């Protein structure tokens, strides 16, 4: 499939959103239009913790299965989510749900990423990014508190999680090469092939 059109018409966004819909719903440019809207509503309201966690476990599992089917020597495949993700989010729910949530998180035992990058940040950076994404169901102050809680769990769990590195993303932008190069170096990722750009004389 190819998406074409003039500059600024929305090609990149459409490619990302459609690719997301056709690839288990985890990489879209904002989740609106991709996820069932009840997922975000329930996250914001703190409802249905086991259902929310099971949904993400199913999304992650589908992507790990897809990655396994498409893996090959020299190939680098990125997935969002790992067992540590499901475990870190347990902290945001009342203790009476924790046993059921741990049972859901155990699904992540089958996932074996070569590297897990835990992104962490200051609350100022997080507030800026939450404001920028402007989700209809998000209260910014509540989301910042939620981030602090979950971020602390990621930091606590990371030392015991295999092949896991914690990277503070403050000051890093992922829309420019410097930020990406920093992540690649810090995580010890393999080199990537770059298509060269050349100035060429007209004929």
Task: Annotate the PLM regions.
Residues 52-60, 96-101, 142-150:
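Soluble or luminal CAZymes and related metallo-dependent hydrolases
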Residues 3:
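Hydrophobic anchor at the beta1->P-loop junction of P-loop NTPases
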Residues 20-65:
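Conserved substrate/cofactor phosphate-moiety recognition/catalytic segment
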Residues 6:
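P-loop (Walker A) phosphate-binding loop of NTP-binding proteins
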Residues 128-137, 142-203:
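NTP-dependent small-molecule kinase module
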Residues 14, 18:
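Hydrophobic positions on the alpha1 helix immediately C-terminal to the Walker A/P-loop
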Residues 11:
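Conserved lysine of the Walker
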Residues 68-72, 77-136:
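ATP-dependent NMP and nucleoside kinases share a basic, alpha-helical "lid"
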């Amino acid at each position: 499939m190819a998406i074409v059109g003039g500059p600024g018409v929305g090609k990149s966004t459409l490619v990302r959103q459609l690719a997301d819909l056709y690839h288990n719903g985890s990489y879209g440019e904002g989740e609106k239009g991709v996820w069932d809207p009840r997922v975000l509503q329930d996250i914001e309201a703190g409802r249905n913790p086991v259902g929310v966690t099971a949904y993400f476990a199913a999304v992650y599992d589908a992507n790990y299965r897809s990655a396994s089917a498409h893996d090959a020597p020299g190939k680098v495949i990125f997935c969002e989510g790992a067992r540590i993700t499901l475990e870190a989010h347990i902290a945001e729910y009342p203790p009476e749900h924790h046993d059921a949530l741990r049972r859901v998180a155990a699904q992540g035992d089958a996932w074996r990423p070569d590297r897990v990058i835990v992104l962490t940040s200051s609350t100022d950076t997080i507030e800026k990014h939450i404001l920028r994404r402007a989700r209809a169901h998000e209260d910014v102050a509540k989301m910042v508190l939620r981030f602090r809680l979950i971020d602390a769990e990621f930091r606590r769990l990371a030392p015991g999680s295999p092949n896991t590195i914690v990277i503070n993303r403050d000051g890093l932008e992922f829309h420019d090469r410097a930020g990406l190069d920093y992540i690649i170096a810090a995580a010890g990722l393999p080199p990537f092939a770059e298509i060269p750009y050349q100035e060429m004389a007209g004929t």
